[in-house]
């Protein structure tokens, strides 16, 4: 049996569960109980995902259990612009070697995303299911812009990549590639102090009281892309029915 600590963010009608030992492994549901019930299967799927991408993973154990190690109430990253919790493990300094592991996970998530959307005609990229829904193209722009934003939580504005100033002029797939390349390059140049500090950036946010660390930003980068890859997968499935 394997037991994993999990962390949850809870509002009145939504809950997001995270397995921080497996960055990118999350479950979003309408209640705490449903989230916790679904997390063991999500962990098993995430381990299978890591194996598919060639990551070293221990042999599968049965059963998988979860233990709530921390909870945050009243807010969570359920919609663009929402604040996200800083859990105790997020406060640990990130080593350069650990950063490369996160970058590898980001690469796996990007490979999954591109496998879904590369080759789609413009008609499908721009199809809107209803008045409130986002097109796939808009989701892709959001994914790239989010990487800018995560980096901007950690690095001084004057040190951010100049390529970001006119990124909206790039075709969407060139945009995604540029954002990833420049974001990773800038993150690799974080100082030791920046990789261990907890900061409260007030720029480009409605939540200046939200704490950030390098580990939280890297975790959210992996989680965020995997969440939106799932969203696009659902859109494409709906288009087939």
Language-model segment annotations:
Residues 5-18, 22-29, 36-55, 114, ...:
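Short, contiguous alpha-helical
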Residues 14-15, 81, 85, 92, ...:
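Generic signal for short, ordered secondary-structure residues
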Residues 88-119, 167-200, 216-221:
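Acidic/histidine-rich alpha-helical segments that form the ligand environment
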Residues 63-65, 122, 197:
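Generic secondary-structure boundary/loop-capping signal
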Residues 1-3, 44-99:
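Short, charged, surface-exposed hinge/linker loops at domain edges
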Residues 6-8, 77-78, 84-85, 111, ...:
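Short, flexible segments with low predicted structural confidence
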Residues 63-67, 141, 167-168, 177:
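Short alpha-helix boundary/capping motifs
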């Amino acid at each position: 049996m394997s037991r994993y600590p999990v962390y949850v963010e809870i509002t009145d009608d939504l809950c997001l569960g995270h397995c921080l030992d497996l960055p990118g492994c999350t479950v979003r549901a309408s209640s705490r109980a449903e989230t916790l019930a679904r997390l063991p299967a999500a962990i098993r799927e995430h381990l299978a995902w890591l194996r598919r991408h060639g990551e070293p993973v221990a042999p599968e154990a049965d059963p998988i259990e979860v233990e709530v190690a921390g909870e945050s109430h009243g807010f969570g990253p359920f919609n663009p612009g929402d604040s996200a919790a800083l859990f105790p493990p997020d406060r640990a300094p990130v080593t350069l070697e650990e950063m490369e592991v996160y970058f590898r996970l980001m690469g796996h998530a990007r490979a999954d995303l591109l496998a879904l959307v590369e080759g789609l005609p413009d008609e499908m990229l721009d199809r809107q299911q209803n008045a409130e829904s986002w097109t796939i193209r808009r989701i892709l722009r959001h994914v790239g812009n989010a990487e800018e934003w995560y980096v901007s939580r950690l690095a001084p504005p004057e040190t951010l990549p100049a390529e970001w100033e006119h990124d909206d002029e790039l075709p969407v797939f060139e945009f995604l590639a540029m954002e990833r390349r420049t974001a990773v390059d800038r993150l690799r140049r974080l100082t030791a102090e920046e990789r261990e500090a907890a900061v409260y950036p007030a720029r480009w946010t409605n939540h200046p009281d939200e704490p950030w660390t390098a580990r939280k930003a890297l975790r959210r980068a992996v989680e965020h892309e995997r969440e939106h890859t799932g969203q696009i997968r659902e859109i494409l499935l709906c288009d087939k029915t």
